[in-house]
Amino acid sequence: MAFFIADDCIGCTICAKKCPVHCISGNVQELHVIEPELCIDCGVCGSYCPVNCIYDGDGMQTFKVDPKDRPIAEVNVGNCTGCIACVEICPFECIEMKTENIDGRFFEVADVVHKKVCVGCRLCEMVCSDKEAIVVRWPDGAAAPDFRNPGYYL
């Protein structure tokens, strides 16, 4: 079920700017709306909302997360096939391909080059052919749980 925005929205627009699938609309200083058919339930909008007015599909409130505490994508070079699916899907162009020397052989692999821009939306994980190649992790290195599960918040 899609996330939704409560009436106490201040219209700051940050949720719309950070949404990886552009499913949030609204004017400055007016209530914003999430298009449920487009929402991927990633929770990124709620993790940026300064007034905590975004709720998941079960009606659970989401809360703002400090930028230094947000999970971001990391590539396990040894598992990356170089398929470029993650590069193509990343809405914020955080991932690029680079040449990596693995055991004396050169391969094109993904690299998260703009870590501060990554919102942890997990689109890269969803399209990765090898689920171990790219993982969204907390700053301490622990794998972040899937926030599309009910009751999980960034």
Predicted feature locations:
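Tandem repeat domain/solenoid detector
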Residues: 36, 52, 71, 77-78
